[in-house]
Amino acid sequence: MSRFFANGSDSESESSEEEVQATNFNKASAFQFSDDEEEVKRVVRSTKEKRYENLTNIIKTIRNHKKIKDIPNTLSSFEDLTKAYTKALPVISKEENGITPRFYIRCLAELEDFINEVWEDREGRKNLSKNNSKSLGTLRQKVRKYIKDFEDDLSRFREAPDQESEAEDEEAAQDSDGGDAGDDSDAGIKREPAEAAPKVAKTVPAKAAPADDDDSDDSIDWDSDSETETESSDDENQYQNMRERFLKRTTEKEEKDDDKRKDKRKEQKIKIRKRPEDDEDGEWETVVKGHVVEKPKMFEKDAEIDIPLVLAKLVEIMSARGKKRTDRRLQIDLLFELRDISDQHNLGTAVSVKIHFNIISAIFDYNQKISEPMKLEHWALLLEVMQSMLKLLLVNPDIHMSESVAEEHEELATSPFYVRGCPLAAVERLDDEFTKLLKECDPHSNDYVSRLKDEVNVVKTIELVLQYFENDGNNNERCRIYLRKIEHLYYKFDPEVLKKKRGEIPQNTQTSVDVMDRLCKFIYAKDDTDRIRTRAILAHIYHHAMHDNWFQARDLVLMSHLQDNIDAADPATRILYNRMMANLGLCAFRQENIKDAHHCLVDLMVTGKPKELLAQGLLPQRQHERSAEQEKIEKQRQMPFHMHINLELLECVYLVSAMLLEIPYIAAHEFDARRRMISKTFYQQLRSSERQSLVGPPESMREHVVAAAKAMRCGNWQACANFIVNKKMNTKVWDLFYESDRVREMLTKFIKEESLRTYLFTYSNVYTSISIPSLAQMYELPVQKVHSIISKMIINEELMASLDDPTETVVMHRSEPSRLQALAMQFVDKVTNLVDVNEKVFDMKQGNFFQRGNMGNRGDRGYNRNQDGNWGGQLRDIKRIRGQRIQRGRKHQQQQQQQVQTIDEE
């Protein structure tokens, strides 16, 4: 029979049956398969086999690229490897309980070694092409960043790189044979026990050895068992079309294979993950990552545990500190175990304190990069250990812990105890780590709120250190810990302070202002370093300004002379100074000191970079204005989000203060060519708005202030107040103030007063006299207030007028020129300046081209006159022009005097 028929029998009856069946099939089912194709067992592979095969293929590709140093392709293959591992994570977490396969760790270790080898070869790097060099740097950064999550696995692998676990052998076997399990029956038989071989031979025909002749099909030894023939014929009858042949078949052998693999894997996992409490002897250890790591033994079984032995073990553990291949997590675990052993054998509190301090140092050392924040589990552990150590120190006052105690002078056995260490440095580092954690979080997320809740524990730890140093510490240490306490307190608003001012609570109630006074005054008296004292003064001023103690804050600024030497301070202190000035300006604004508020804020706002000056963010810079290292340093100096000052509030207060000062000044010096600008920023905003041909309704905060300024120039206080105090501005700005209603009332009052002053400056030349009650009614002010404002203007010689008390009127003197006269005088001044400039240009063009030595010789004069023109006539013209200019000036002065006399007579 032909080999293309489904059944390989020589029987004519079977062949006729096949022909009858073939006539009933459609064209799609008419395709038949050869005997070789029937022998191939089609099996759908599991997801694990697919994922692992993909990983191994990429790893082989990476190794090939490393051999020829093809770095760009190595980079692309590494990216493919990370993506493939990400896809395989669900399988790994399900099948391996999250244990990273050893072959994957081996690949990462080899890749890291390859990169380090190429990177350290400086001569070889110089010979690399531009593409290879660029790819090497990118690959190095990506690999170093990626392997951070596999540090523990890599460290264990490097300790025993040649050790192969049973799990890796099984994975390697599955990776190499998983894809060919259905094609090679011998491979499947080899993985089975010897007893299962006969059954497999019955169900799966063995593949014969290859023969030299072409008729190898005829030499196949078929089993003559009738059951096998029946089964094979039944199998052939089952597949009536192509689709059914490719559906997965689950044989009895495969089911047994799967069951045995699962049982073996379960036994292995149970052996690895067995808990100590499940064993009677308690000798089993929990292994985190896949294979057993033997922990170093602390002491011998029959060793006598005493203080020297524990200290020797402590020195042994800490001697590995900072070394390259030190397992930092294991080091922390060993220290905790040593602490427990010390407590079990009652070796004393001093030994426990020393071990606590070394645990704190080990936790700090876990993160090698100082600029990066520590992990959250380490942070929680650090807080717990720190507070535990400080409580031990407070309960046992006979323990003296100081960095001045040398190692050989430590006393841990008898009281008084002396322990080497510095809890102050530890709590300062703890505070810095807390700030890093806050900066790392998104300020608008719940993580930031969760981290911010830890500030309670940080402040509690600082309080414990403060109590310890108040009992046992020098002035320098107390000043340092007081400053840490101040830095957590100075920016927080305490409503009890204002209630105490109003008498709503007893006067003996201690508020945050009282605490700040006590801490800062101690630093003022005892500190011998300028930095701590300066920062304490700045924080003290900030806290006073936040609680509206304007005069105390102002006096501290003036008496300390901070503004004279702040430029020599460190960047962190300068940032605190900028924050203090910003808050002082807000305080002055709330206390109705508009001019002082403007003076405090002008230096911050005129630069256009208040965000950077207050360390609340970085502005986008041009390409070469800031290097990457400078940007990194500036980011480290940024303030946490909860300490930020609202920049829009700050700018609005500055612009409103500038408006209240600038608009009356512009109206008073409208025709003064030499008038100065009070606020350059506000003046630019006003001029840019005036240059626009079409101005729409205001939308932003700046547009509202500019529109209010235009209304104030006309004396329209109601429109001005509506632009400044409205629903949109309340939401953006004014509601951010404590007691915002009082601030809005203060703003409305100032707008009325400055609008009145602007009105009098602008229209004083129109009125002969004006009624004070009419002005009071127009601006909704008390008559006494209007009288006071006008009196001040007259005294300061801003308004040329006099008050007539019987009639309650203001009589204008009209001593100032009218608008037309002022414009005419400006025109005369400009024409005079133009004439002077033209005369100077004329003199420069004429020059002196004759020799001064021959001026007395008439012949030479005649020669010069004939050759270059009449120079004598030119001199006469110059004298005549100068005489005319002097006469015009005298006439102009006489005319002005006559005008003044005429005005006085009228």
UniProtKB/Swiss-Prot annotation:
Pfam families annotated for this entry? eIF-3c_N (PF05470), PCI (PF01399)
- GO terms for MF: RNA binding; translation initiation factor activity; translation initiation factor binding
Ranges annotated as biased composition (Low complexity): 195-209, 894-906
Q: Where is the composition biased (Basic and acidic residues)?
A: 242-270
Ranges of biased composition (kind: Acidic residues)? 11-20, 162-186, 211-237
The answer to whether UniProt assigns keyword Membrane to this entry is: no
Task: Domain (PCI): give its ranges.
Answer: 641-817
Q: Where in the cell is it found?
A: Cytoplasm
InterPro entries, sorted: EIF3C (IPR027516), EIF3C_N_dom (IPR008905), PCI_dom (IPR000717), WH_DNA-bd_sf (IPR036390)
* GO CC field: eukaryotic 43S preinitiation complex; eukaryotic 48S preinitiation complex; eukaryotic translation initiation factor 3 complex
Instruction: Tell me which Gene3D superfamilies the record gives.
Output: 1.25.40.570
Q: Which UniProt keywords apply?
A: Cytoplasm, Initiation factor, Phosphoprotein, Protein biosynthesis
Q: What is its main location?
A: cytoplasm
Q: Which PANTHER family match?
A: EUKARYOTIC TRANSLATION INITATION FACTOR 3, SUBUNIT 8 EIF3S8 -RELATED, EUKARYOTIC TRANSLATION INITIATION FACTOR 3 SUBUNIT C-RELATED
Q: How does it assemble?
A: Component of the eukaryotic translation initiation factor 3 (eIF-3) complex. The eIF-3 complex interacts with pix.
- Functional description taken from the UniProt entry: Component of the eukaryotic translation initiation factor 3 (eIF-3) complex, which is involved in protein synthesis of a specialized repertoire of mRNAs and, together with other initiation factors, stimulates binding of mRNA and methionyl-tRNAi to the 40S ribosome. The eIF-3 complex specifically targets and initiates translation of a subset of mRNAs involved in cell proliferation.
Task: Give the protein's recorded name.
Answer: Eukaryotic translation initiation factor 3 subunit C
Source organism (scientific name): Drosophila ananassae (Fruit fly)
Q: Give the gene that encodes this protein.
A: eIF3c
